[in-house]
Amino acid sequence: MNPRRLSLVGLLGLIVVGLTTPAFAQTTPNAKIDRAVRAGLLSGARTQSVIITVKPGYRETIRQALQQHGDRIKAEHPLIESLTVDLHSEDVAELAKQPWVNAIAADAIVSAKSDLSNLITQPSQTLATTLRPTLGLPPLPTSSTMTGATGVSVAVLDSGIAPNDDFTGRITGFYDFTQGGIPTNPYDDYGHGTHVAGLIGSSGKLSNYQYVGIAPDVHLIGFKVLDGTGQGKTSDVIKAIEYIIANKAKLNVQIVNLSLGHPIYAPAKDDPLVQAVEKATAAGLIVVASAGNYGQVQKGSGSGYTGITSPGNAPSAITVGAAVTNDTVTRDDDVVASYSSRGPTWFDAYAKPDVVAPGQALTSDTNASSYLYKLLKGSQVSKNGQQFLTLSGSSMATAVTTGVVALLVQAHNQSGYHRQLPLTGNLVKAMLQFSAIRLPGVDRLTQGSGEVNAAGGIVLASAINTSVADGKWWLAN
């Protein structure tokens, strides 16, 4: 037997000596190892970057054992009792045998969820004339009650936010988790996050109010977790979520936008990114996540199922697919985009997405020096002497939905019924689903409960009294 492996087994044995070990339900060791890690083992990789989730109370001891064994601890995640480790592949199986190890998952690459393949020849669409009206909103906000104002803040976990006059005074924080989570001046070298932020809350000033976001007064907090190529690490996204939860009151954040993800490699209970999202929801945050862009089995071959990505498979997340409005206000001609991921989810067979929202060919803010802007020359839009970009995907639909959620939170805050209990993620999801408009001839695993209806959701959010006693009606009138 390999002496290195013996060393790790011996060190792990100290855990049994040093700790009172309760009886654990036994799980087949191989079932603890996710698909990506197993693929790495089959490929012969010497080491793998993994996220090890352990039973409560064992994280510190396992960290010490791994360090003594020469494995590099890259991060700890107290939120989900996990460690990110550069682990020798030959030790994966031994770790999985330990009863205090719950799961071993890859520190998977996450990426932005825009469908670049659908954009090269895609003509630009006009945001102001159809996007807001198809949601039941006026083309331009007519009062302060539908702007996302009154202290509503959204955490945008993406490639960054490039500051411009559409966001003046409303980017209230920026943290670069591709560089360890340092606070810094806002920037976006990839361009995806700026586009997402614009859909959520652009004032429209730069475009002479042609491209106004859904909640144009909302505050934005940027968390850069994707690099200049639009990719990042799961562990960095988890660290950003941990920071948001720990500083929720200081940041005054209510909503988290996750227009990113990776393929599902494990059941939700063993997926560290999903578990971080579940903790965020439990902490009172409203998490909106993209369904993914894997709706086609192969490009041009029709729509397929089970394409939902992580963390869109998080039970508590509001998971959003992309709809095509055909640039009309009416819903009569709306369809779900062919690329929009369908449910059910792998492993757990959860019914996702929860809703769909406009996500096809939406024009929004950009950074002219960003990777995406330079790449997608056919998607560049010039308006009022300024540059914008047209993108499609569940990322865009997620941003639109996040803007709608900001309006719901504002409507509830202004109703006077919020003083005891704010809106929760599950309640907001229920309101979006109840008020959504079903698309005819489309199944539930494709459209969820239907296409988001902002006007209907605002009415519900304004009427719900969350301070009433258990067993009483929440609707005020």
Identify what each model region corresponds to.
Residues 58, 203, 207, 225-316, ...:
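Substrate-binding/access-modulating region of protease and related hydrolase catalytic domains
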Residues 38-39, 253-257, 357, 384-388, ...:
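C-terminal subdomain of the subtilisin-like protease fold in secreted/lumenal serine endopeptidases
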Residues 31, 35, 60, 64, ...:
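Solvent-exposed, polar/charged alpha-helical surfaces in well-ordered, non-transmembrane soluble domains
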Residues 127-140, 374-385, 423:
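Surface-exposed intrinsically disordered loops and tails
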Residues 180-182, 261, 332, 336-338, ...:
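Flexible glycine/proline-enriched surface loops and loop-helix/loop-strand junctions
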Residues 2-145, 153:
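Autoinhibitory N-terminal propeptides
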Residues 42, 67, 71, 96-100, ...:
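Sec-exported extracytoplasmic/periplasmic mature domains
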Residues 26, 72, 141-175, 182-235, ...:
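Subtilisin-like serine protease catalytic core
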